[in-house]
Amino acid sequence: MVIYHIIDIKWMTIKNNSMLFLTIALALGSVIAVSTISSTSTAFANHDFVANLTGQEEVPPVDTQATGDAIFIPILPSNDTVDFNVNASGIQNVTAAHIHSGIPGENGPIAVTLFTFDPTQNPDQNGITINGTLTGINLEGPLQGKAISDLLTAIKDNSTYVNIHTVQNPNGEIRGQLSSTK
């Protein structure tokens, strides 16, 4: 947000010079304050984070036909919430999905539980779609007690992944590293 003040100096008198100075000072102060707020609140502006989920990304790799994707969208201006959508097809007996802390090729601790599911409630399941909103209260493990901005920083640093767990593969059937779309 930029605030513009237009002043016609041609018609100003000496008496109004102090008013001109005050107006300019207030305008500059407003621009500086708004710029400071905007730079912190838009740290992740235009950054959606995505993951393509496959069995080959699991550690060790899992032989499965299941695939999926996940998208995480920071909600501006505060970046203290993240909307997400996780889809998977060709997958059965899903028990949970998480964001884990971990670099590619390594397993890591759970940072966020996206959902848990009782597969006996839907035995004919052949896919899953889940969406929701994350806040700081959802953070656990290495991110417990931290802010959503810490999760976003970890995602941006390529040190988080999404995986979906099943009865057949309790450590994860499909996985994908989260990365920025920018």
PLM features per residue range, with description:
Residues 1-45:
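Secretory targeting signatures
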Residues 20, 34, 40-97, 101-182:
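Metal-centered catalytic cores of metalloenzymes
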